[in-house]
């Protein structure tokens, strides 16, 4: 049984005040495309005949589930008082051969009979990827259905007058449909219905709460900001859960409060992130001791483009696409990344080398692509790579694990995805490594890792602040002097200082299980069993990389003197004139790069 409907309000067609925006929040681009496809051919037939314009036959809407593709079509159909026929895999698929094709023919015949000069007829095909999948993954029945649909759409010839039938289809897997459907003459236009941004989420929340009583304390703007990655269906479920929470509290006066939305948000999450752990970290800048200058740089690079995006657009500034944090192990690189994500209220996707290196061919690359796709849908978002040197190690380095084919494929995929961030908004790649020399040079250029920050071991003041952070929930004895302990823990990293505080508490409990405070003797006992893993030589090595990175931005690439001369003189005399030309060119090149050669030989 086909789902057939006309506009339920006969007076809507004559009421110019009602528009689809009354029931749809955001998605202006898709709304305009649908209006042009459905309404324009019937509103401007004379202009079309004058210009010889042939209107498109079909429009394909694609995007994640729950973004409102079906609602968009229904709203525009209602706005223009069109006749609508809805086809779905459930309504088309039949048990016996030939019956599915008959359903399609009947639908197009019914649409043609209702199409008149001033009233369009629309066929909406939902989940078209199920009806017409790619040819390498379909059954015999799918072949027959696809062939019948091709025939029916091709018979719906466009002309200078209005088309007989307008075909609109939707899918959340645009790459899974038959490519023959996407060619010109069938689905001429493809329009993405993307995940709503902050402004669109606010409009959707206002639509779903316009008939309920809201407490003055409810800030829909703040709720919209906190709902990264939520689609329209998720926001509808959020409002429904908030109403249920309010009804449980009091059935007499149904007033939604901020607490109701907080409870609802703990129940309803973004559907695009189901199956993976994606959350905004609860780590704040206060949880990171010291590193004031570094935190300020991260705030400017991560927070500002998200919180002040309008200012960046106004100034014509492109936000950074990647930031690399390098430094010794245990110096709070991961904590800094989480604090930046929390401050920017961005979704946080964390990937480690263990997740990306799989025994199955192509699985790691698929996970990488899928993570970037989910990050685009849940923007603003941060993708964090821990131990980035394993995934992005130098190609051709025989001593590295990345010399394998798997590592090279992962690196190629990462480079491709990072280059694709130029068109995406609100996505930042954060990476951390304690082997910056091992990172492939292709990633170290601007446009990929635009900012390279050195996370040094904590100095005296930073160690004091770190000790304060990790002892703020502990009861300390009067004889505990954290500043003195900081002076005694030179070369200790943040992770080692955290371990020192934890071990001190454990020593206190070993002494007396009923202990209520930690005293200085406990810290001294714990410190005697802990040794810093860092050495002065290692710290100097990390510092030298930072200095070398700064020099490489301003100095020309050094040339090896031996290699330059041997390239010229290695040719034999039999090459005649060609060898003389090469020799002259080499001498000219050598003389004009003498300074660079001296620098190279000195280093």
From Swiss-Prot:
GO biological process, one term: cell division
Highest classification ranks of the organism: Eukaryota, Viridiplantae, Streptophyta, Embryophyta, Tracheophyta
Keyword terms: ATP-binding, Cell cycle, Cell division, Cytoplasm, Cytoskeleton, Nucleotide-binding, Nucleus, Protein transport, Transport
Similarity remark: Belongs to the AAA ATPase family.
Role of this protein: Probably functions in cell division and growth processes. Interacts with certain SNAREs as part of specialized membrane fusion events where vesicles from the same organelle fuse (homotypic fusion).
Organism of origin: Arabidopsis thaliana
Binding site for ATP: 63-70, 327-334
Major location category of this protein: nucleus
One family name in Pfam for this protein: AAA_lid_3
Protein name: Cell division control protein 48 homolog B
UniProt key word Cell division: yes
Gene name for this UniProt entry: CDC48B
Localization of this protein: Nucleus; Cytoplasm, Cytoskeleton, Phragmoplast
Domain of life: Eukaryota
Entry GO terms, CC: cytoskeleton; nucleus; phragmoplast
UniProt xrefs under SUPFAM superfamilies: P-loop containing nucleoside triphosphate hydrolases
GO MF terms, alphabetically ordered: ATP binding; ATP hydrolysis activity
The keyword Transport belongs to this UniProt entry's keyword annotation: yes
């Amino acid at each position: 049984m086909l789902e057939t409907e006309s506009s339920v309000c006969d007076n809507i067609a004559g009421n110019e005040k009602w528009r689809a925006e009354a029931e749809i929040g955001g998605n202006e681009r898709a709304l305009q495309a649908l209006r042009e496809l459905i309404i324009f051919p019937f509103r401007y037939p004379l202009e079309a005949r004058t210009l010889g314009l042939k209107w498109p036959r079909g429009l394909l809407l694609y995007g994640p589930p729950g973004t409102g593709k079906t609602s968009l079509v229904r709203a525009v159909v209602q706005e223009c008082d069109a006749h609508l026929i809805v086809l779905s895999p459930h309504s088309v698929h039949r048990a016996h051969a030939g019956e599915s094709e008959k359903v399609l023919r009947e639908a197009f015949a019914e649409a043609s009979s209702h199409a008149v000069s001033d009233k369009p007829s629309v066929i909406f095909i939902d989940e078209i990827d199920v009806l017409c999948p790619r040819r390498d993954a379909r059954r015999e029945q799918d072949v027959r259905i696809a062939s019948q649909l091709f025939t029916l759409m091709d018979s719906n010839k466009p002309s200078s007058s209005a088309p007989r039938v307008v075909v609109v289809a939707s899918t959340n897997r645009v790459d899974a449909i038959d490519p023959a459907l996407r060619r010109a003459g069938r689905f001429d236009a493809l329009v993405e219905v993307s995940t709503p941004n902050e402004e669109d989420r606010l409009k959707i929340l206002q639509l779903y709460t316009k008939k309920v009583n809201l407490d003055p304390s409810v800030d829909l703007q703040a709720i919209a900001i906190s709902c990264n990655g939520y689609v329209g269906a998720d926001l509808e479920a959020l409002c429904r859960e908030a109403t249920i929470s309010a009804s449980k509290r009091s059935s007499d006066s149904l007033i939604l409060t901020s607490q109701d939305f907080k409870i609802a948000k703990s129940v309803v999450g973004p559907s695009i992130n189901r199956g993976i752990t994606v959350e905004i970290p609860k780590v704040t800048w206060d949880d990171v001791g010291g590193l004031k200058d570094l935190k300020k740089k991260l705030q400017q690079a991560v927070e500002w483009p998200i919180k002040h995006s309008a200012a960046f657009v106004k100034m014509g500034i492109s936000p950074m696409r990647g930031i690399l944090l390098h430094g010794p192990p245990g110096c709070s690189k991961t904590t800094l990344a989480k604090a930046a994500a929390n401050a920017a209220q961005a979704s946080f996707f964390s990937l480690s080398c263990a997740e990306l290196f799989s025994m199955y061919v192509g699985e790691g690359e698929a996970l990488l692509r899928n993570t970037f796709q989910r990050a685009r849908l849940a923007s603003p978002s941060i993708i964090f790579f821990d131990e980035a040197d394993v995934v992005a190690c130098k190609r051709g380095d025989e001593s590295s694990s990345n010399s394998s084919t798997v590592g090279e494929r992962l690196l190629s995929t990462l480079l491709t995805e990072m280059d694709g961030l130029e068109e995406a908004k609100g996505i930042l790649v954060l990476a951390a490594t304690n082997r910056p020399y091992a990172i492939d040079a292709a990633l170290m250029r601007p446009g990929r890792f635009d900012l390279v920050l050195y996370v040094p071991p904590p100095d005296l003041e930073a160690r004091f602040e770190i000790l304060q952070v990790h002892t703020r929930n502990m009861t300390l004895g009067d004889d505990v002097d954290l500043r003195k302990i900081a002076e005694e823990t030179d070369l200790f990293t943040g992770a080692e200082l955290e371990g020192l505080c934890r071990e001190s508490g454990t020593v206190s409990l070993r002494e007396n299980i009923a202990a209520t405070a930690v005293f200085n003797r406990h810290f001294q006992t714990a410190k005697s069993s802990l040794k810093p893993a860092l050495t002065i030589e290692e710290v100097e090595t990390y510092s030298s990389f930072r200095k070398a990175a700064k020099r490489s931005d301003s100095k020309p690439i050094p040339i090896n003197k031996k290699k330059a001369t041997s390239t010229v003189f290695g040719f034999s005399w039999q090459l005649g004139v060609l060898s003389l030309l090469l020799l002259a060119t080499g001498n000219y090149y050598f003389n004009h790069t003498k300074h660079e050669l001296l620098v190279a030989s000195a280093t």
